[in-house]
């Protein structure tokens, strides 16, 4: 069964997935490979609706895999009702990684290599509203929740590896 790592941007989904399995699937990288450009460039060129369609198609593909796979999802994967229904069908294997808004905001502010449009184009208050909206959706889908704030990615991966 596919284990989906859910959570807000900056929480460490990709880093933890890499600790769990060197052959993990990162939905954002899969999408970028399909479109031949960065997601931020695609957003600018084609818009969010086109991106969300690609994201839904990619989610369907990774959930259809027969083998046990670790998947790092994009932070906005839960915005689509169709995606939420697909994720619900992956019952017992949806793992939410959490941290406080302030911790995530600070991480994103310090990350000079990966500047994300959603972060750059909103005030802190607007970004907090996005965080709250998405957290409610993540929590409604999560079978297991792990707070990552005082844990290393390796410790979080060990917790996930020991889950039944």
From Swiss-Prot:
- Which residues participate in substrate binding? 28, 52, 75, 134
Q: Does the keyword Signal apply?
A: no
Q: What is its EC number?
A: 2.7.1.71
| Stored InterPro entries | P-loop_NTPase (IPR027417), Shikimate/glucono_kinase (IPR031322), Shikimate_kinase/TSH1 (IPR000623), Shikimate_kinase_CS (IPR023000)
Instruction: Give the required cofactors.
Output: Mg(2+)
- Which GO cellular component term is one of those annotated? cytosol
Signal peptide extent: none
Which pathway does the UniProt entry assign to this protein? Answer: Metabolic intermediate biosynthesis; chorismate biosynthesis; chorismate from D-erythrose 4-phosphate and phosphoenolpyruvate: step 5/7
Q: Does Plastid show up as a keyword for this record? A: no
List positions binding ATP: 10-15, 116, 151
Its GO biological process annotations read: amino acid biosynthetic process; aromatic amino acid family biosynthetic process; chorismate biosynthetic process
Q: Which Gene3D superfamilies match?
A: P-loop containing nucleotide triphosphate hydrolases
* GO MF annotation: an example: magnesium ion binding
Q: Which reaction does it catalyse?
A: shikimate + ATP = 3-phosphoshikimate + ADP + H(+)
The residues that the entry says bind Mg(2+) are 14
Could you tell me where this protein is found in the cell? Cytoplasm
Chief site of localization: cytoplasm
Q: Which note does the record give on the cofactor?
A: Binds 1 Mg(2+) ion per subunit.
* Record key words, sorted: Amino-acid biosynthesis, Aromatic amino acid biosynthesis, ATP-binding, Cytoplasm, Kinase, Magnesium, Metal-binding, Nucleotide-binding, Transferase
Tell me, what does this protein do in biology?
A: Catalyzes the specific phosphorylation of the 3-hydroxyl group of shikimic acid using ATP as a cosubstrate.
Family the entry assigns: Belongs to the shikimate kinase family.
How does this protein assemble?
Answer: Monomer.
The entry's protein name is Shikimate kinase
The record lists the organism as Streptococcus equi subsp. zooepidemicus (strain MGCS10565)
Starting at the broadest rank, the lineage of the source organism is: Bacteria, Bacillati, Bacillota, Bacilli, Lactobacillales
């Amino acid at each position: 069964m596919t284990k989906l790592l859910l959570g807000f941007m900056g929480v460490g989904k990709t880093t933890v997935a890499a600790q769990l399995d060197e052959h993990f699937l990162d939905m954002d990288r899969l999408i970028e490979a399909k479109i031949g450009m960065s997601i931020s460039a695609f957003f600018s060129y084609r818009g969010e609706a086109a991106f969300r369609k690609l994201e839904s198609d990619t989610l369907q593909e990774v959930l259809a895999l027969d083998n046990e796979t670790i998947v790092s999802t994009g932070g906005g994967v839960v915005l689509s009702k169709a995606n939420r229904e697909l994720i619900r069908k992956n019952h017992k294997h949806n793992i939410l990684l959490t941290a406080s808004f302030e911790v995530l905001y600070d991480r994103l502010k310090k990350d000079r290599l990966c500047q994300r449009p959603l972060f750059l184009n909103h005030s802190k208050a607007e970004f907090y509203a996005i965080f709250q909206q998405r957290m409610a959706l993540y929590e409604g889908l999560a079978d297991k929740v792990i707070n990552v704030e005082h844990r290393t990615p390796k410790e979080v991966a060990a917790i996930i590896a020991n889950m039944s």
